Amino acid sequence: MQTNFGTLFEAQGILRYTEKPTYKCILEIDQEIVNYYRWFLPKCLEINPQKYRAHISIVRKEIPKNLDFWAKYEGKVINFWYQNVIYNGEIYFWLDAYSLDLEKIREELGLSNLWIYDKPLIGFNKIFHITLGNVKKNLFD
């Protein structure tokens, strides 16, 4: 699907939940998506790979208000869309990702999909992301 900000590609991932040490819900995605887009990152920067295997965070640093739905979709295959545009901030490089199914899961858990940083594409309420890497300095050097 073509947008004003690049092309959207459809992919799938597997939903995983953990409760310890904190509540986390992620969509495990194909590592090759990250590997492919990392190739395009500037070679003049020392960009570290992401800390964990390729994923999209759905719940992170939040406590769900409605735990009756926690782990309801464990292991379920979920569709998502991602853009072929690499974004970066001071530390991170990422791809934007979108999924109405992931938004629904957040709603069931009593979490907001309100996104205040950027405007999501029409039809979506939240922008998720796929981390490609970071430029954090190694504290042990």
Question: How does the language model describe each region?
Answer:
Residues 1-141:
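Histidine-dependent nucleotide/RNA phosphoesterase domain, centered on the 2H-phosphoesterase fold
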